[in-house]
């Protein structure tokens, strides 16, 4: 159980920390300046996308795709909910302070960036033939075409 869910929880924590760091940076350095707040928010989203991309590439090489998709869904979903519901409280705001529109827009951006990053990561690894299933088929093909071992006679 620990081996399965520890990496998923770690992914959720890392994504949440990146989001909170972006919120704190926006609060400290861009309080009141919309352009700077937007720029810092986009940088935080880009870092989230990079983390999801790297995690997807790492996991797809070692695990079956359905398991990777499930783990990513739980990790990213948990991080998204924590970032949207808990993150604002850590910088002195409230989740619905600027209305429901911004609240749901944050969710869609977060999930959209994560889905695109995961899709790109999976697509690249599968195209290169480095995913778990391609490697299994490669081993099978090598084993099936190999000459049988000769039995040593005594």
Where are these regions (language model features)?
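Alpha-helical membrane-associated segments of multi-pass integral membrane proteins
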Residues: 92-139
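Membrane-interfacial segments
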Residues: 25-34, 60-64, 89-94, 98, ...
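C-terminal halves and exits of single transmembrane alpha-helices
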Residues: 74-98
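N-terminal signal-anchor transmembrane alpha-helix
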Residues: 1-48
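Hydrophobic faces of alpha-helical transmembrane segments in multi-pass integral membrane proteins
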Residues: 10-18, 44-48, 73-78, 82, ...
